[in-house]
Amino acid sequence: MKTENTTLNLAAHRLDVKNRPLCLSGKGVTKYFGIGSKVTKAVDHVDFEFHEGELVSIVGESGSGKTTLSKMLLGLLNETDGEIFFQGKKRDISTRAKKKEYWQGIQAIFQDPFSSFNTFNKIDTVLLDCINMRGGKHLSKEKKFEMMTEACSFVNLKFAELTNK
């Protein structure tokens, strides 16, 4: 079995969402492509919980399974193993009608990498805007710095190296 040595991270901004209803979740979500000795494990037993109102980013290297996971979440690909739940119930997209009903309750916004960031903005400005938009305006500078550092480390980046701080 061929397995890529890549990392897929699900980053979610978790201010004030713990008590919100669970929207989408998964246990052991896995996807294989190919047959026999030429099997590629595209997504390897991913667990996740997304709550209503939560902003979620799927971040990873090229080939880490971001697009495959997104397609499974949207119901465009079936998972090889594991389960996906929508609003607390096992998702059923076995018919066209059921898939259409599911699509009425879920939506993805795909990022255009060329228009996502203003090249004149520094990364700390972008991260600070995210914190403030998600209810963190009242937090201390130290707490915001800690959150920005944690967000960067979650995707294997060093905040200090990105910002020269």
What are these regions, as identified by a protein language model?
Residues 67-68:
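Conserved Walker
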Residues 74:
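Helix-to-loop junction immediately C-terminal to a conserved catalytic motif
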Residues 112, 119-133, 147:
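Q-loop/switch helix immediately C-terminal to the Walker
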Residues 59-61:
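The feature captures the beta-strand-to-loop junction immediately N-terminal to the Walker
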